[in-house]
Swiss-Prot record:
It comes from Homo sapiens (Human). This is TBC1 domain family member 3H. GO terms for cellular component: plasma membrane. Residues 350-443, 507-526 are annotated as: Disordered. Expressed in heart.
Length: 549
């Protein structure tokens, strides 16, 4: 028996042992428990959400009692909406009531209707059982699933007992989904999402709710868990654009400390929504997210940055992920109604400015998300498709000078990021632009200045910050040899002084090393790489490009 067979048999035995523990029930040796324990067994240690506390809960405050009475009065309104769903499913009244709060005993049926789980069950009869059995036999992530289940909502009465009924149902859902969607397979966040569904839905309904949540374009949640998801990049770019517009100082500090590239606030936000705040606020935010869709993510992120503006400006590069998570958790450590009130106001503001969703990708981009185009250092971040036009060149580079080199045919080309092409030789002519070759008429006709609006269109999807490129490999692959001003002025001067041109051509080379030093330094400077985007033969007057590129 070779090593592969031994490893395969060991994994199979490990998988069977884990499944057997869940099949036996609570504590993997006691008789199988029939469900969650009743409320009276916890001696008034359970709140209205099902969270078990270590000490006995104090009596209800006036605010909590008012909230319970309010939920009871709202129940009849939600029942009426469910009875006439075709009328209310796209109405403003549904959104208004979702922000005010969804009653707990209505949340399960409402989630099922929003995610259309009944239709999925009718279209796929018996498929969940098949996927579940296949997952038990061939799961590759069962150890990770078992480890994550042990830490999922353990303070809730449904998931308090190890290997209990709800933990077994959660295992079945995750195994079935791993088999159902191999592209996503299993991720850590799926355990918390499925556990939230199990609080209010049966096992099979919770499975199809998870399927619909990740598959629907309305919520775009699969991009956070799939390696091929392109929507998440568009949401991340839009989030950076929104935060840079509303909180420029905060975003400027994040860029200065290079924190945005190390941790994604949007990805952190998804984890916070799953298992980082109080369960009551988590459920209310999920209610809004299921009703509004992906456009609710931008307002939530904007509120988090706005509330934590002072703390985020003091965030250093040391441990940015932990600091970000702590700041976001502190953001939601406040009254639920207050958070939802600010969320609704932010939602209306971003919708009015059309900043709640990223701009649609162009057809040639396919599924890839649009990248933001930096206008200038310290300015606004523009995205493709924005109504605002990108700014013009800075004043100190009013007009570039075309190279005076004779026309040459390109020998080879090398593709560069963003669609640009680097050519080994530098052709003078370009389509749509007159050739700037030296005029034969007179010395003054040797110069051809090109205005900015007549320049060839440069790639705008490059991730460039200022005159310097951040990525070393990209900078190495897109060197542009800049022609010095002396070389550009030499043909003009020779045209005006033909005698000096003949004298310099027949002059003997100097043997003095000191006299040749400036020319050698100049040649070395010309051969040295210069910064800037690949311009495909277009040479500027200076070796540094304007900060607006």
């Amino acid at each position: 028996m070779d090593v592969v067979e031994v490893a395969g048999s060991w994994w199979a035995q490990e998988r069977e042992d884990i499944i057997m523990k869940y099949e036996k029930g609570h504590r993997a040796g006691l008789p199988e428990d029939k469900g969650p324990k009743p409320f009276r067994s916890y001696n008034n240690n359970v709140d209205h959400l099902g969270i078990v506390h270590e000490t006995e809960l104090p009596p209800l405050t006036a605010r909590e009692a008012k909230q319970i009475r309010r939920e009871i009065s709202r129940k009849s309104k939600w029942v009426d909406m469910l009875g006439d769903w075709e009328k209310y499913k796209s109405s403003r009244k549904l959104i208004d009531r979702a922000y005010k709060g969804m009653p707990m005993n209505i949340r399960g049926p409402m989630w099922s209707v929003l995610l259309n789980t009944e239709e999925m069950k009718l279209k796929n009869p018996g498929r969940y059982q098949i996927m579940k059995e296949k997952g038990k036999r061939s799961s590759e992530h069962i150890q990770r699933i078992d480890r994550d289940i042990s830490g999922t909502l353990r303070k809730h009465m449904f998931f308090r007992d190890r290997y209990g009924t709800k933990q077994r149902e959660l295992l079945h859902i995750l195994l079935a989904y791993e088999e159902y969607n191999p592209e996503v397979g299993y991720c850590r966040d799926l355990s918390h999402i499925a556990a939230l569904f199990l609080l209010y839905l049966p096992e099979e309904d919770a499975f199809w709710a998870l399927v619909q949540l990740l598959a629907s374009e309305r919520h775009s949640l699969q991009g956070f868990h799939s390696p091929n998801g392109g929507t998440v990049q568009g949401l991340q770019d839009q989030q950076e654009h929104v935060v840079a517009t509303s909180q420029p100082k905060t975003m400027g500090h994040q860029d200065k400390k290079d924190l945005c590239g190390q941790c994604s606030p949007l990805g952190c936000l998804i984890r916070i929504l799953i298992d980082g705040i109080s369960l009551g606020l988590t459920l209310r935010l999920w209610d809004v997210y299921l009703v509004e869709g992906e456009q609710a993510l931008m307002p939530i992120t904007r509120i988090a940055f706005k509330v934590q503006q002072k703390r985020l400006t003091k965030t250093s590069r040391c441990g940015p992920w932990a600091r970000f998570c702590n700041r976001f958790v502190d953001t939601w450590a406040r009254d639920e109604d207050t958070v939802l009130k600010h969320l609704r106001a932010s939602m209306k503001k971003l919708t009015r400015k059309q900043g709640d969703l990223p701009p649609p990708a162009k057809p040639e981009q396919g599924s890839s998300a649009s990248r933001p185009v930096p206008a200038s250092r310290g300015g606004k971040t523009l995205c493709k498709g924005d109504r605002q036009a990108p700014p013009g060149p800075p004043a100190r580079f009013p007009r570039p000078i075309w190279s005076a080199s004779p026309p040459r045919a390109p020998r080879s080309s090398t593709p560069c990021p963003g669609g640009a092409v680097r050519e080994d030789t530098y052709p003078v002519g370009t389509q749509g632009v007159p050739s700037p070759a030296l005029a034969q008429g007179g010395p003054q006709g040797s110069w051809r200045f090109l205005q900015w609006n007549s320049m060839p269109r440069l790639p705008t999807d490059l991730d460039v910050e200022g005159p310097w490129f951040r990525h070393y490999d990209f900078r190495q692959s897109c060197w542009v040899r800049a022609i010095s001003q002396e070389d550009q002025l030499a043909p003009c001067w020779q045209a005006e002084h033909p005698a000096e041109r003949v004298r310099s051509a027949f002059a003997a080379p100097s043997t003095d090393s000191d006299q040749g030093t400036p020319f050698r330094a100049r040649d070395e400077q010309q051969c040295a790489p210069t910064s800037g985007p690949c311009l495909c033969g277009l040479h500027l007057e200076s070796s540094q490009f304007p900060p607006g590129f």
